[in-house]
Amino acid sequence: MLILGLRRGELLGLAWDEVDLESGVAHIAWQLQRIKGELQRRPTKTASSEAPLPLPDICSRALAQRKVTEARSRLAAGEAWMGSGLVFTTRFGTPIDPRNFQRFFQARAAKADVPVIPVHATRRTCASLLVALDVHPRVAMTILRHSQIAVTMDIYSQVSSASTKEALKLLGNQLGEGVL
């Protein structure tokens, strides 16, 4: 989630037939949501959300490991296996309820002794890290699958105080030298 900037529903709605580990691409076109008490796989938020997403090696390796884990779960579950075709499932192959994922995420954070944050904060963190790495805003917009650049820059990006300090220092130096 953090590396790809996925929304919780996009992660939980990702199916194996939308992941190409050989070419290293995931096609994010669906999301899993609870609607009127029922889990439903629905199209993503916007057309720009459906863009193919290149998978960094760390993600491809994690997904390959997930396939192995799923195969073990399928064997252990036996006839109780309810294969949904989704990448992330319960030990019986059923979709993971978004609320349960939130609880699991928070429990893992607490166990790792890191600050417990909302799942969606990983998406904002992804955007902020892309900014800190000087990734062009249009590239960040594509990674986060936003339809408007303003959403990427205004809502998700947080400029660090160190970045602000450095920018003002550079500006001050330029003005002090009479360059501008």
Predicted regions and their residues:
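Short, basic (Lys/Arg/His-rich) helix/loop patches that form interaction surfaces
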Residues: 4, 53, 69-79, 83-142, ...
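C-terminal secondary-structure termini that scaffold catalytic or DNA-interacting sites
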Residues: 23, 31-59, 64-65, 69-74, ...
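A short, basic/aromatic helix-end/turn motif that makes direct DNA contacts
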Residues: 13-19, 141-147, 155-158
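Short, charged phosphate-coordinating catalytic segments
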Residues: 1-32, 138
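ATP/adenylate-binding site constellation spanning eukaryotic-like Ser/Thr protein kinases
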Residues: 16, 60, 124, 146, ...
